[in-house]
Every structure is written in C-alpha cells, then in structure tokens.
Amino acid sequence: MRLAFWLYEGTALHGISRITNSMKGVHTVYHAPQGDDYITATYTMLERTPEFPALSISVVRGRDLAQGVSRLPATLQQVEHHYHPELTVIAPSCSTALLQEDLRQLAAHSGVAQEKLMVYAVNPFRVTENEAADGLFTELVKRYAANGQKSAVPAVNLLGFTSLGFHLKANLTSLRRMLSTLGVKVNVVAPWGAGIADLARLPEAWLNIAPYHEIGRTAAEYLEQEFAMPAVYDTPIGVEPTLRWLRSIIEKLNEVGAGCGASPISMPALHDFSLDGMSAPSGVPWFARTADMESFSNKKAFVFADATTTVAMVKFLRDELGMKVVGAGTYLERDADWVRRELEGYLPGELMVTDRFQDVAKVIEDELPDLVCGTQMERHSCRKLDIPCMVVSPPTHIENHLLGYYPFFGFDGADVIADRVYLSCKLGLEKHLIDFFGDAGLEYEDGDAADETGVAAAAANGHSPAGGSTEGEGGMVWTGEAETMLKKVPFFVRKKVRKNTETFAMEQGEGEVTVEVFRRAKDSLGG
C-alpha cells in the first residue's frame, strides 16, 4: 500500500456525483463516514454555478454500528422531503463495503417509492472516477431511454458532457454553433442539464455524438445496439479532425434521412463556421506557416493527460503545429490500448501509462521538453523545472474553470489551443531580456549598490564572485566565467544547457567546465 495523494483520478463517488450533479432532479446519497462529503466543496469552488451540489451524506457512525442501526433510511426520507428529487442514487463507500451492508435492503425500508431510488452498487475499492461515471450514466440510459417517434428534422444527442468537465460550457457552445450552421437540431445534452424525461427522449434523435472516450461512449454503444441509432465517436480537436467530424455527421445523418425522405444535408461554405461569418473558421493553418511558428518545428513537446486529450493533443501538436512529440502518456490504464492504437506511428517510444505523478515528473526532467501539455500535476512539476506547461486535461484547478469562451473543440478550439501553445512557449521572454540586459542603464545607482552588496556578501562567505567556481547539479565544477556565460542563456532552456554541457565535459574527461569547454560543448551540440 502506498500513500495516496495528488491522485489523477478521484474515487468512485467523484464519478457518481459528476453524473448526478450534472442532472436536474437527481440527487446522490452517499452512505459513508462523516467527512467523506468533502467533495461538495470541490463543486462549489470550481463549478461556478449558483446551485448547491446535489449530494447528501448518510453518516456511518461507530455507535450506530454497535446498536445495529443505520441512518440510511432516515436520510433518504429527509432528502425526499427536502429536495423532492425524481431519482435518488445511493452510492456505497469503502466503509459500507467492508461492513457488507445491504444498501438495497436498507433503501427498501426507507418508505420512499422504490422507483425513485437507485442503488449503484459499484465496488469502491476497484472502480475509480471515470469508470464509475461512465457506468452510472449508461445504467441511467438503460433505465429510462424509451422508444419514441423520430424527430421530423435532423437532430442529435450530445453525450458525455458532465459536471467538472474540462472547458465544458465553452466546448458545448462550440459544438452547438457548428451543428446550427449545418442546420442540425440538438435533441438532448446528457448528462449535463438533462432530467429523467430528457433521457427518455434520447431515441428521438437521428444520431448520437460522444466525443469523450472516457464517458458517454458506452451509453452511445447501447443506444446503437438497442435503438439502431448511429453514433459519431470522433473528437473534434484541431482543424482537420473537426472537418472529418463534420463530414462524418453529415454522412450519417444523410443515411438516416434517406430512409425517411428528408432532404440531404450538404457542407456549408467554411466561412459560415467563423465567428463573423466572413473569414476562415480557424487561423491555425496559416498561423502554423508564419515565420514565427516555423521555429516550432524544432521544439519538443510531451503530453500526459486522459485518453481523449492525449490522442487529440499529440496529433494536433505534430500534424498541425509541426512540433516534435518526444513522449506521451495517460493515467487511464483501462483506455491505454485504445490510445496506443490511435497514436501508432506518432510516438518515438512506448506510451507511458502510470498514475504516479512522480514518474511523470522524472520523465519530464530527463527529456526537458520545450512544452508540456498535461494536468494540474504537471503544472506543479514543470514549475519546479522552469519548463512551460499548459493544462489540457483533468485533474484541474480553478484557473481552468473559466467564465469566458475558451473551447478546445471545433475551429474555435483550434485557435485557443494554438494561442496557448504559442504563449506557453514564448512567455518568459521578457524575464530573459531582463536577465540578459539587466536594467539597461536605468536606476544606475541602485544597480551599483546591489552589485556592491552582492560582492560584500560573497566575500563574507569566502567566495570570489568574479573568478570563483561553483558546483553544478551533476557534481561538475563550473568556473565563474563559465557560469557568467551560462546566465546569458535564456532561463527556460538554461537547465537543459547546463545538463548537456556537463555531460559533454564528462565524456571529454574534463574536470571542470571552463569557458573553453562551454564553447566546445556548444559547437558539438549544434548550439
């Protein structure tokens, strides 16, 4: 057993509550020890919605266990009286699993109508966030989806959008805009914003769209099997993937429409998808070919995220921005085979599959890429290494739950991602200029005073600031002149240059790094 902290995936409760908190008229009762309802704070802090999380806790106490009683029936009655939900989902905890409590039996004695209760008996020890969320959503679809008359006009369902989803609202807005441009109606978005009645209407649509591999795909497969509803599983991240996504939707809708005599849908002019209706829908194709972006072809990137994002970002960085992907990975072991198939030919080595952020940080430190696309964990790791990092996937923090329109999906999303890649790699240039040029002659007296203070401090410690030596991270000694030259290297690649120079010096049998050794290392490494 190892200490669990900084987890990439939350518990099964996280997944269950992401589904129920997304929906209208659905409530979760968590049968667990007091304190396990901390998850409500996550939603109130990050979600930025006026509603309080639809989650209550049925406390498991030692005294109750000793007396052979359970608070679950009373809690269910209180939830029914106070919230009047259409459905209450009862979620087990590790404690109830260890105690082997029969939640169905306890729920049956609550006095609440059984059709308004659902025990989602997932194993809390083995099942984590995404699997629990996908499983519960699929169970809800199986329970409530019903045969109905098909929509008279082309209509689709958007599946897998959940509470705490990455850039959720902006991604939905981007998809709605593109579908509206096609003349396609959105029948139901689920689970986000959907009620029980909306789940019943799912089969009325012509097509299901499930862009996330983690959540929604299984439900779409069930609807395809039971109601003969075709589905599109592609993720529209990037310009070319978005075009393929649109063509796939048009093709499948026209197949359905041909059976009911509907007029075929055709691809509109591309400028119709732009925000102003007049220009190209995305600036990425020409932006990637500008002189400024051409230099990105030599930059190295590392990606670590959930399955959907890892696949999409690796392809976007290489295919559309021309960057060199030196490695990629995911923390979702159950989706690793799918990621491997999707990224065949894209990676120089094996896909990294781990849920230990320390292992990911070690790879980043060894590779020293120019850009990392990852999670909140990689943001922290890269901050210590002075490596640019952009968060592209859960787990995230509050700065990734924005009020503005910053989608990752669609043409608009391609522009947002390209901007962030560019800024993440370029930000810090002003810091380098200050490092390089100093105060440029401004506030000269303060600069002299600071220099004198530094000289005095160095002398007091027995060091010679001008000609002294320092020891590098690898144990290699650097002369003062070599250190001064190293400081002229931009800070965001300085660590890499130091490491490469020390490696060169050791290979050449040098005992210390001098200016001459530094210059030879630079020439040898093509710098």
Curated annotation (Swiss-Prot):
SUPFAM superfamilies, A to Z: Helical backbone' metal receptor
Binding residues for substrate: G428, L429
Coiled-coil stretches: none
Keyword Mitochondrion set for record: no
EC numbers: 1.3.7.7
Any one GO molecular-function label of the UniProt entry: metal ion binding
Cofactor annotation comment: Binds 1 [4Fe-4S] cluster per heterodimer. The cluster is bound at the heterodimer interface by residues from both subunits.
Named cofactor requirement(s): [4Fe-4S] cluster
Family matches, as InterPro entries: ChlB/BchB/BchZ (IPR050152), LI-POR_suB-like_C (IPR013580), Nase/OxRdtase_comp1 (IPR000510), P-CP_red_C (IPR042298), Protochl_reductB (IPR005969), Protochlorophyllide_Rdtase (IPR016209)
Binding-site positions, [4Fe-4S] cluster: D36
The UniProt record lists the keyword Transmembrane: no
Reaction it catalyzes: chlorophyllide a + oxidized 2[4Fe-4S]-[ferredoxin] + 2 ADP + 2 phosphate = protochlorophyllide a + reduced 2[4Fe-4S]-[ferredoxin] + 2 ATP + 2 H2O
Pathway: Porphyrin-containing compound metabolism; bacteriochlorophyll biosynthesis (light-independent)
One GO BP: light-independent bacteriochlorophyll biosynthetic process
Residues annotated as the enzyme's active site: D292
Primary role: Component of the dark-operative protochlorophyllide reductase (DPOR) that uses Mg-ATP and reduced ferredoxin to reduce ring D of protochlorophyllide (Pchlide) to form chlorophyllide a (Chlide). This reaction is light-independent. The NB-protein (BchN-BchB) is the catalytic component of the complex.
Record text on subunit structure and interactions: Protochlorophyllide reductase is composed of three subunits; BchL, BchN and BchB. Forms a heterotetramer of two BchB and two BchN subunits.
Protein family: Belongs to the ChlB/BchB/BchZ family.
Protein name, per record: Light-independent protochlorophyllide reductase subunit B
Organism: Chlorobium phaeovibrioides (strain DSM 265 / 1930)
Lineage: Bacteria, Pseudomonadati, Chlorobiota, Chlorobiia, Chlorobiales
